[in-house]
Amino acid sequence: MGNFGRVPVGIVGASGYGGVQLVRLLMDHPEIELVYLGGESSVGKSFASLYPHLAHAVKLSIEEVDPEVIARRCEVVFLSMPNGLACQIVPTLLEKGCKVLDLSADYRFRNLTTYTTWYGVERSDRTTADTAIYGLPELYRDRISEAQLVGCPGSYPTASLLALSPLLKQGLIVPETAIVDAKSGTSGGGREAKTYLLLAEADNSLAPYSVVRHRHTPEIEQICSDLAGHEVTVQFTPHLVPIVRGILATVYATLRDPGLVGDDLTTIYTAFYRNSPWVKVCESGIYPQTKWAAGSNLCYIGVEVDPRTGRVIGMSVIDNLIKGQAGQAIQCLNIMMGWDETLGLPKMGFYP
């Protein structure tokens, strides 16, 4: 244990947007002591030199990534690394007794062939991958509570699945008709310089990207199939919008019972998420906005029915860096440790 009985925690990949969100949130967590920050490109630099606005709170420097050293100093390790790297060190961390929460895609898939097909990385850690639990607490809370390794969901899948789950779990829709139309802010592309994320490129523009080939597609389909009880194919199209943080996922599907109305669905969603403190279902006729969730771990959901088409429209908003990334990982840790699910996480968004 760390000072004052707190749990010693490390972060590998601390210099990216996901990493800095983890640092910021963990520094305020009452049960955590942040003792290690690791990375590659920033080794030897103080964290304060990378993020001067946190200099008053974080006195650590970026260290080399050595799983043996990490395991000696940390009881819990968050991995915020590019896809294909976490799987190189996770087996050692688990062997040494660490609890691991991976924010990359490496441990989200039950079928590693699917992972390799979409991410292009061959894997030799199938035994380890078989022990991973998908880290969406609203669906898999009980499994997460007993996990040693959690594969934290992507931001698009988080927003999309929270909107779709009540419909699929209750058998209310024809699963094969599900369409997800999602918009994300630029921070979802990471901190590394990319032409399409330049202000001159992204501002005053809205653009679809990775149409029919976005890597989050099979992740969404995997969980939809789990909920439906059979293999499901989903049409998913992401868009980049000129905001910094936030995701809006709008889902469409054909209802099995065309007699259902919006009030019915609102009641069903509210009941489905009654034990989920981070999901807020809007009153009938109210639709969520990304600004509501910004800076918080909340997901706001609105739902409507179009009687002309017999389709349901579900709308879900999250902060892609918090509920879609770092905050959800900490939510999973709280569950793994037996703490209150809301501990150390922001409950109110920035507004305006």
UniProtKB/Swiss-Prot annotation:
<dbReference type="GO" id="GO:0003942">
    <property type="term" value="F:N-acetyl-gamma-glutamyl-phosphate reductase activity"/>
</dbReference>
<dbReference type="InterPro" id="IPR036291">
    <property type="entry name" value="NAD(P)-bd_dom_sf"/>
</dbReference>
<dbReference type="InterPro" id="IPR000706">
    <property type="entry name" value="AGPR_type-1"/>
</dbReference>
<dbReference type="GO" id="GO:0051287">
    <property type="term" value="F:NAD binding"/>
</dbReference>
<comment type="function">
    <text>Catalyzes the NADPH-dependent reduction of N-acetyl-5-glutamyl phosphate to yield N-acetyl-L-glutamate 5-semialdehyde.</text>
</comment>
<dbReference type="InterPro" id="IPR050085">
    <property type="entry name" value="NAGSA_dehydrogenase"/>
</dbReference>
<dbReference type="Pfam" id="PF01118">
    <property type="entry name" value="Semialdhyde_dh"/>
</dbReference>
<dbReference type="GO" id="GO:0005737">
    <property type="term" value="C:cytoplasm"/>
</dbReference>
<comment type="pathway">
    <text>Amino-acid biosynthesis; L-arginine biosynthesis; N(2)-acetyl-L-ornithine from L-glutamate: step 3/4.</text>
</comment>
<keyword id="KW-0521">NADP</keyword>
<keyword id="KW-0560">Oxidoreductase</keyword>
<dbReference type="GO" id="GO:0006526">
    <property type="term" value="P:L-arginine biosynthetic process"/>
</dbReference>
<protein>
    <recommendedName>
        <fullName>N-acetyl-gamma-glutamyl-phosphate reductase</fullName>
        <ecNumber>1.2.1.38</ecNumber>
    </recommendedName>
</protein>
<keyword id="KW-0963">Cytoplasm</keyword>
<keyword id="KW-0028">Amino-acid biosynthesis</keyword>
<dbReference type="InterPro" id="IPR000534">
    <property type="entry name" value="Semialdehyde_DH_NAD-bd"/>
</dbReference>
<keyword id="KW-0055">Arginine biosynthesis</keyword>
<comment type="similarity">
    <text>Belongs to the NAGSA dehydrogenase family. Type 1 subfamily.</text>
</comment>
<dbReference type="Pfam" id="PF22698">
    <property type="entry name" value="Semialdhyde_dhC_1"/>
</dbReference>
<dbReference type="GO" id="GO:0070401">
    <property type="term" value="F:NADP+ binding"/>
</dbReference>
